[in-house]
């Protein structure tokens, strides 16, 4: 798809309504990983205190469009789902412009044996308050409740808006593609458990940071779970057929996928392999994998 000609491209720089309490401003950062761009959400009614979810990349044009759109408004909270470079860096400029509190996920932490963060994490992220699973912030006519959904990243949060039975899903559920799970910070077992956690909820609509709203959430999540189980089975089958390295598996499993996405696919295959190894189903010697 030519992202420049996608209907969403007309939305760049304009704050557009999604529901009575939700508006979206699309950043002009389309790519094979962000689809048409990062969707920055504004929650609340004009003239009252607002929350901004995922302010987006450190892009002057997007930040200017956001601050212009919110001129004369009161922003009480800047809410972060996770600390990737297309989601959180604009929080610094938006906080400086509005004085709002930065809240949401915890900063990524270092392990004893090295960084958990991947190359795309935001080192500038410094929240005023970290929200744990089930904790909420409030504004006039709205509540946002944190739902811890590790997997894409260890610190990923979704945010429920109970007034509209809506869930802001960040990158845990995207409206156009499956989510990349990239070790060491991404974890496939956590991702699958977090999808199952969403199945136990009764949200009516998802607002992903990338892509369009998901209006049949339960069906969509079941599809994502089935897709990942299918990929897991493909990994096991590939090893059984003698494809014992990740490059060989990716070439076979993702032959019909844009090759620009193959490095990300390799990270997700690695996440599957690590999960299978922990479960005692596969083993590795250096970069070669075998059935255990």
Task: Tell me what each language-model feature is.
Residues 81-87, 152, 210, 272:
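Histidine-centered divalent metal-coordination motifs
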Residues 237-292:
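C-terminal regulatory/interaction regions
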Residues 8-9, 13-73, 158-170, 175:
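Conserved beta-strand hairpin/beta-sheet module of binuclear metal-dependent hydrolase folds
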Residues 18, 97-98, 202:
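Short, structured coil segments at secondary-structure junctions
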Residues 35-36, 57-142, 165, 215:
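Active-site HxH/HxHxD metal-binding segment of metal-dependent hydrolases
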Residues 48-52, 57-59, 116-126, 143-232:
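Metallo-beta-lactamase
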Residues 21, 66, 210, 235, ...:
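Residue-level signal for inorganic ion chemistry
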Residues 100, 228, 232-236, 266:
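Short, leucine-enriched amphipathic alpha-helices that occur as contiguous helical runs
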């Amino acid at each position: 798809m030519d992202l420049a000609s996608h209907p969403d491209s007309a939305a760049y720089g304009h704050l557009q309504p999604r529901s009575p309490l939700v508006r979206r401003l699309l950043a002009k950062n389309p790519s094979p990983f962000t689809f048409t761009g990062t969707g920055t959400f504004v929650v609340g009614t004009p003239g009252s205190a607002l929350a901004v979810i995922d302010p987006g990349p450190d892009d002057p044009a997007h930040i200017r469009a956001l601050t212009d759109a919110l001129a004369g408004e009161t922003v009480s909270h800047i809410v972060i789902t996770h600390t990737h470079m297309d989601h959180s860096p604009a929080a610094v400029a938006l906080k400086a412009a509005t004085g709002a509190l930065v809240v949401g996920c915890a900063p990524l932490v270092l392990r004893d044996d090295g960084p958990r963060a991947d190359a795309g994490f935001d080192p500038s992220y410094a929240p005023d308050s970290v929200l744990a699973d089930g904790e909420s912030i409030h504004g006039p006519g709205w509540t946002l409740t944190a739902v811890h959904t590790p997997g894409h990243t260890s610190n990923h949060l979704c945010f429920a808006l109970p007034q509209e039975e809506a869930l802001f899903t960040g990158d845990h559920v995207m409206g156009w593609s499956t989510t990349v799970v990239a070790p060491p910070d991404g974890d496939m077992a956590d991702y699958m458990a977090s999808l199952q956690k969403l199945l136990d909820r009764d949200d009516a609509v998802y607002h992903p940071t990338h892509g369009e709203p998901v209006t049949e959430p339960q069906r969509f999540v079941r599809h994502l779970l089935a897709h990942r189980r299918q990929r897991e089975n493909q990994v096991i089958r590939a090893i059984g057929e003698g494809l014992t390295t990740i490059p060989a598996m990716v070439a076979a499993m993702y032959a019909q996928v844009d090759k620009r996405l193959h490095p990300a696919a390799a990270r997700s295959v690695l996440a599957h392999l690590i999960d299978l190894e922990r479960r005692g189903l596969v083993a590795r010697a250096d970069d070669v994998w075998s059935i255990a």
